[in-house]
Amino acid sequence: MPEVKSDIEIARAARKQPIMEIGAKLGIPPEHLLPYGHDKAKVSAEFIAAQKTNGNGRLILVTAINPTPAGEGKTTTTVGLGDGLNRIGKKTIVCIREASLGPCFGIKGGAAGGGYAQVVPMEDINLHFTGDFHAITSAHNLLAALIDNHIYWGNEQAIDIRRIAWRRVMDMNDRALRQIIGSLGGVANGYPRETGFDITVASEVMAILCLAADIRDLEKRLGNIIIGYRRDKSPVYARDIKADGAMAVLLKDAMQPNLVQTLENNPAFVHGGPFANIAHGCNSVVATTTALKLADYVVTEAGFGADLGAEKFFDIKCRKAGLKPDAAVVVATVRAIKMNGGVKKDDLGKENLEALRKGCANLGRHVQNVKKFGVPVLVAINHFTSDTEAEIQAIKDYVRTLGSEAVLCRHWAEGSAGIEELAHKVVDLANAGHSQFSPLYPDDMPLFHKIETIAKDIYHASEVIADKLVRDQLRTWEDQGYGHLPICMAKTQYSFSTDPNLRGAPSGHAVPIREVRLAAGAGFVVVITGEIMTMPGLPKVPSSEKIRLNEAGYIEGLF
């Protein structure tokens, strides 16, 4: 049996083209590519603005079933499908998110795909890349510093220090920083107060960068951030302490999309990186809309399962950016479906048709949920060597009962050649005119009813549990003019419920709301459910333990 190469070995052996050549394929002149080395570049804001009058290509969303430790390969399928479409002669750009350092050194892994369906340079993308996350972290923490400084020098805006809503962020998993006391050590250090850190991908600044149309829209949204409240409970905005201009300066370059390439030298935008369990889980609007102006097809992903990423892609990103997806692909694996059917991880390599059929309920619900938005669906079965013909056929037969089609894909092992069939079917579906996209709920629906709609229609919950404080807060925001905003649910990615251990397709459960936060700059209301954390912790054995530099100075153990 031939040796199976690791992702990093495959990526390191890639024959990359100079990034200027990748840009030339899209008609981007060299003077509008801002290079970071030879294999990555930012696309200038001037070039992007000049493409506004171009027509749009077809937009394809890649989503998945609920993630399991067995792995689904959503990013791998996104990249593979992009290569597959280019292989059959369709000019295609892949749009994915940047990786966060926290999960890279924690448990989740990287964001560059896998096997022979990756974007490169993989090591750079998974580590510091072009510095976007540093810029976002800096802009966020500048605002935090300015808030404390404003209070220290007299508090002209009369901010109630008990009601400051802005925490600090860092791009790392660190549970020790979730709740802290700041400004200790005496009068010279300010007013002691309780605060804390979130991970950078949960920052409202990250969401703003990913939803802003251009730099002016970015600055306006930054100014709209609510940093806290006065004693009369009126909001204080970032613009009130004159923070928005300096924050925009820090984000000027980060606002421009990053161009890289796949292993097969096809263009990919990697830009922005909000998580889908604690944020809206989509790459930047600027990257997606620019790609639509430059290509016939754009393949993008939304984080975690369709209950989180796809719902937010449709209800937040598409609603705010005026996007209309033409088709969706739900990624599933035999192994993950069996795990949703009750099989333990160590037994996933054994054929188990009974558990597979039981676990298909999870896949079926995701397919039906996507269809609720009026978007036609295909299922991609991401192939593993342990899959049996009977198991693959059982999934195909089940998906057929849903009125959709499942296609076996071998892109991890074979690259674009292994996903040609799906590429052809995506083209046919996207061009058939079946998409009748519509968000799940209207803008004018009351905020709590929007939450109930998501919980009941997408999660199949029977009720939403919220105390009087939460309901009153939602009504206050409606009175202040924020009732039109969409909802961003913060929920475990492992289940349709708020219990991460409840696999399959549970129904009739309750969704408890722990907290609500107004992201006025980003333009949505965050609803925190269950035990979800906006600052993750590291696992008992973090991935960092395997990462090192070898004798030749190359990185080992990254993936």
UniProtKB/Swiss-Prot annotation:
ATP binds at residues 68-75. One of its GO terms (molecular function) is ATP binding. Its EC number is 6.3.4.3. Pfam families: FTHFS. Pathway: One-carbon metabolism; tetrahydrofolate interconversion. It catalyses: (6S)-5,6,7,8-tetrahydrofolate + formate + ATP = (6R)-10-formyltetrahydrofolate + ADP + phosphate. Gene3D superfamilies: Domain 2, N(10)-formyltetrahydrofolate synthetase (3.30.1510.10), Formyltetrahydrofolate synthetase, domain 3 (3.10.410.10), P-loop containing nucleotide triphosphate hydrolases (3.40.50.300). One of its GO terms (biological process) is tetrahydrofolate interconversion. Keywords: ATP-binding, Ligase, Nucleotide-binding, One-carbon metabolism. NCBIfam families: PRK13505.1. Belongs to the formate--tetrahydrofolate ligase family. This is Formate--tetrahydrofolate ligase. It comes from Sinorhizobium fredii (strain NBRC 101917 / NGR234). The lineage of its organism: Bacteria, Pseudomonadati, Pseudomonadota, Alphaproteobacteria, Hyphomicrobiales.
